[in-house]
Amino acid sequence: LEEVDRFIEHEIKPLENSNDNIRFFDHRREDARTDWERNGLPNEEWEALLGEAKRRAIAAGIFSYPFPSVHGGRDGGNLGMAIIREHLAAKGLGLHNDLQNEHSIVGNNIGLLLMLEYGTPEQQADWLPGLKSATRGFAFGITEPDHGSDATHMETVAVRDGDDWVI
């Protein structure tokens, strides 16, 4: 945690405080993050700022904490990630960690866990470098009546029927 704190103090806070970037985190944040001319999509400047923070975290080796050491990471597990996320959340809203859009200087990467657990060696070779460099990512969208976006309580199932799937 001390290494993460030093990184935040020396790299992230100066970036957050330059060019009025603080507008993305104070009372102006919703308007500053939103491009109203593009139907409410995220503002490109906001996205670029998140990208720069992530690039710095990657260069410092902070972002790759959860990756296995054989893939250039630090073998960080779920408990370690939970401790780091709680530590970052306790610091309040900022460029170091923004739960509104799952941005974090420490990679919170569901795709990594899925790929390590279920990916073939070929898929891992294809996907892991991009996940570690944040040039590739996973996303999923789910919703069910009475469950919203809680992936752990979904009731819909898919059953293989020959070459097809029946939902």
Predicted segment positions?
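Short, conserved phosphate-binding/catalytic loop or strand-edge motifs used
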Residues: 104-112
